[in-house]
Swiss-Prot record:
One of its GO terms (molecular function) is GMP reductase activity. SUPFAM superfamilies: Inosine monophosphate dehydrogenase (IMPDH) (SSF51412). NADP(+) binds at residues 203-226. The keyword Ligase does not apply. It is an enzyme of class 1 (oxidoreductase). It comes from Staphylococcus epidermidis (strain ATCC 35984 / DSM 28319 / BCRC 17069 / CCUG 31568 / BM 3577 / RP62A). One of its GO terms (biological process) is purine nucleotide metabolic process. Its EC number is 1.7.1.7. Belongs to the IMPDH/GMPR family. GuaC type 2 subfamily. Pfam families: IMPDH. The keyword Oxidoreductase applies. NCBIfam families: GMP_reduct_2 (TIGR01306), PRK05458.1 (NF003966). InterPro entries: Aldolase_TIM, GMP_reductase, GuaC_type_2, IMP_DH/GMP_Rdtase_CS, IMP_DH_GMPRt. This is GMP reductase.
Length: 325
């Protein structure tokens, strides 16, 4: 079995058929809607909040609201629907979450997207939650995860998941691989490739991306959508504390199972870091779109599907060739 990650891969160009990269279309259909980019910010407290969720929806980007303010979820769904926008929320698998789904159904509050957000998603509890949502809210698009194996993808799809999220601990602020010895850190792109071979429904590649070029690589190896944390963190609009160190501005960024998120030092699988302030999120999204348009032009196409068939080489961690600090 070939094992590789993002840094090990270079995609091989095809003949360009466009006059300008602006002719290339980066939009993606995901569930009932079409979005400008195949990218979603991680549903983490230092990446996503209600104001950003609303802005993303208004501007035709996909988002997933995190689940760490449970009591705010019903008002959030109402607010989004009142504004004529789609609602995309997260749930866990504890007993109160099953009751929450029933409450949504009895109130006729139907989020367009529901993400079951668990670190180890190949589990009976997630399978039971998928079935529960599909029973009570059959029109909601259910994203389930996270998994790292073809078996996990198949079981969640068979339970009724409309999409699966692939990635166990490859993110910058996730230390699952260190604390447990398990995960897809260091071989996330291979894991995505294997899972894609088993998938019949869309996959979200979650974690491990460090550059915009990694979006194109994710699509090449099977992702329909890519979830990104660190590249979206530390913007002007991002949640999180801003600090100044040696004349430079930084913003905090922490993992979803860190003690900073949990409020206690127990079962910690995330850490906190400060990321240099990156300016406007809108500028980053524009740059991301332009870079992906360039990727499509190198693939010899005009849309994302051209990326799925390009050849590649495995270069074993040499693609930065001294260009990285």
């Amino acid at each position: 079995m070939k094992i590789f990650d993002y840094e090990d891969i270079q995609l091989i160009p095809n003949k360009c058929i466009v006059e300008s990269r602006s002719e290339c279309n980066t939009s993606v259909k995901f569930g009932p809607r079409t979005f400008k980019l195949p990218v979603v910010p991680a549903n983490m407290q230092t990446v996503m909040n209600e104001e950003l969720a609303q802005w993303f929806a208004e501007n035709d980007y996909f988002y997933i609201m995190h689940r760490f303010n449970e009591e705010n979820r019903i008002p959030f769904i109402k607010k989004m629907h009142h504004a004529g926008l789609f609602a995309s929320i997260s749930v866990g698998v504890k007993e109160n979450e099953f009751n929450f789904i029933e409450k949504l159904a009895s109130s006729s509050l139907i989020p367009e997207y529901i993400t079951i957000d668990i670190a180890h998603g190949h589990s009976n509890s997630v399978i039971n939650m998928i079935k529960h949502i599909k029973k009570h809210l059959p029109n909601s698009f259910v994203i389930a995860g996270n998994v790292g194996t073809p078996e996990g993808v198949r079981e969640l799809e068979n339970a009724g998941a409309d999409a699966t999220k692939v990635g166990i601990g490859p993110g910058r602020v996730c230390i699952t691989k260190i604390k447990t010895g398990f995960g897809t850190g260091g071989w996330q792109l291979s894991a995505l490739n294997l899972c894609n071979k088993a998938a019949r429904k869309p996959i979200i590649a979650d974690g491990g991306l460090r550059t915009h070029g990694d979006i194109a690589k994710s699509i090449r190896f099977g992702a329909t959508m890519v979830m990104i944390g660190s590249l979206f963190a530390a913007h002007e609009e991002s949640p999180g504390e801003t600090v100044e160190l040696d004349g430079k501005k930084y913003k905090e960024y922490f993992g979803s199972a860190s003690e900073y998120q949990k409020g206690e030092h127990k079962n910690v699988e995330g850490k906190k870091m400060f990321v240099e302030h990156k300016g406007s999120l809108k500028d980053t999204l524009t740059e991301m779109e332009q870079d992906l348009q360039s990727s499509i032009s190198y693939a010899g196409g005009k849309d994302l599907k051209s990326l799925r068939t390009v050849d590649y080489v495995i270069v074993r961690n040499s693609i930065f060739n001294g260009d990285r600090d």
